[in-house]
């Protein structure tokens, strides 16, 4: 039985019902429907913290999904899981791949910036200010891109850019 039919969360159940109705009404191929089912089940598993199961579903969705825009969200969610697992290099790779397919994902730019900022902080703790500055500069570039896509969002990042004089 698909995960979406077993989930007890009201919001997830509502989403599943609406998604199932849309899948019946909107003309799509069986492959697209199957890809969406895996994606939906991946989101459900991810929201419950079942990352291994979520990754399996996302990889299946990637195998079936042909639309670059839809693939970008699958890749983004895979990046989120790697971020949660502390696998920052993998996370950066998946965010980058998502942005290759959809350059209008400010949340991917933001998450990449957060990882770079974290690495800058780590470099400071290790006494390497030159490496730290390089990571902070990269974080600034990613945050600028996120802010450009969604002005008014990422207020803390915007303030950090001003305070550190990285905002142009």
UniProtKB/Swiss-Prot annotation:
Pfam families: TPR_1. Disulfide bonds: none annotated. TPR repeats lie at residues 35-68, 72-105, 120-153. It is found in: Plastid, Chloroplast thylakoid membrane. Keywords: Chloroplast, Membrane, Photosynthesis, Plastid, Repeat, Thylakoid, TPR repeat. Its main location: plastid. It is a peripheral membrane protein. GO terms for cellular component: chloroplast thylakoid membrane. The keyword tRNA processing does not apply. The keyword Plastid applies. It comes from the Eukaryota. GO terms for biological process: photosynthesis. Essential for the assembly of the photosystem I (PSI) complex. May act as a chaperone-like factor to guide the assembly of the PSI subunits. Belongs to the Ycf3 family. PANTHER family: CELLULOSE SYNTHASE OPERON PROTEIN C, TPR REPEAT-CONTAINING PROTEIN MJ0263. HAMAP family: Ycf3. This is Photosystem I assembly protein Ycf3. It comes from Solanum bulbocastanum (Wild potato).
């Amino acid at each position: 039985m698909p995960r979406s039919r077993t989930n007890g969360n009201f919001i997830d159940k509502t989403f599943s019902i609406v998604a199932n109705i849309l899948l019946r009404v909107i003309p799509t191929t069986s492959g697209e429907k199957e890809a969406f089912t895996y994606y939906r089940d991946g989101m459900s598993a991810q929201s419950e913290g079942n990352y291994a199961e979520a990754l399996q579903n996302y990889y299946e969705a990637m195998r079936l999904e042909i639309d670059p825009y839809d693939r970008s969200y699958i890749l983004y969610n895979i990046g989120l899981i790697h971020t949660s697992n502390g696998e920052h290099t993998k996370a950066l790779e998946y965010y980058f791949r998502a942005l290759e397919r959809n350059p209008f994902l400010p949340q991917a730019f933001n998450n990449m910036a957060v990882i770079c900022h974290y690495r800058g902080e780590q470099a400071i703790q290790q006494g390497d200010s030159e490496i730290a500055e390089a990571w902070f500069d990269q974080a600034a570039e990613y945050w600028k891109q996120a802010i450009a896509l969604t002005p008014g969002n990422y207020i803390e990042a915007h303030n950090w850019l001003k305070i550190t004089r990285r905002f142009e």
